[in-house]
Amino acid sequence: MAGHSKWANIKHKKAAADAKRGKIWTRLIKEITVAARLGGGDADSNPRLRLAMDKATDANMPKDNINRAIQRGVGGLEGANYEEIRYEGYGINGAAVIVDCLTDNRTRTVAEVRHGFDKYGGNMGTSGSVAFLFDHIGQFIFAPGTPEDKLMDAALEAGADDVITHDDGSLEVICPPHDFAKVKTALEAAGFKAELAEVIMKPQTEVVFTGEDAVKMQKLLDVLENLDDVQEVFTNAVIGE
């Protein structure tokens, strides 16, 4: 299946992540803690914990930090009790935005997220107002030059739904979220290391922004992403060059 260019966006995302590693560690510690609390401290039987631990390792987080977060989650250490909350809303020009949070203070978080939407012309909607515009998937992005046929064989055998070839030569493997850990392990065993591997809300259609609208929409997304309680921001907005 063919698709449009992804590689520049992936490289930008990785560079941005490297630039705010301290914040990423904080988010990952929260995610590890919640994953361990909900599914137990054994990563082999807890796919969500395995994914969070893999992300933490990729972000160069020390093992001690990871283990402490797991212990906090299973009740071995004291710490904040985080609650998962999803907010949905619209940016300018009807672009859909999903904001996933982990918080120990729902009142604070909803006020900050609402302010983020309002500040740059967006508005926060009700639960379910935009989620139907996205698909919940596991996603793996591979660099241009990755052998397509071999990757496709390994991915489909592992249980992936699709392999997409983008115009820039990068490859995208899509799988059901509940099979993410299994597919990731199988691909790595076959010698394929993804540049980006995550469970996401993927937009079914996109809204392309250019000029001043692009600047304004990017500012809205940046404000939301920089909130302390925000774990992930998903949008169907595509910011043009």
UniProtKB/Swiss-Prot annotation:
Keywords: Cytoplasm, DNA-binding, Transcription, Transcription regulation
Signal peptide feature range: none
Disulfide bonds: none
Main location: cytoplasm
InterPro entries linked: Integrase-like_N, TACO1_YebC-like_2nd/3rd_dom, TACO1_YebC_N, Transcrip_reg_TACO1-like, Transcrip_reg_TACO1-like_dom3, YebC-like
Gene Ontology MF annotations: DNA binding
Gene3D superfamilies according to UniProt: 1.10.10.200, 3.30.70.980
Family recorded in the similarity comment: Belongs to the TACO1 family.
Protein name as it appears in the record: Probable transcriptional regulatory protein Rpic_2388
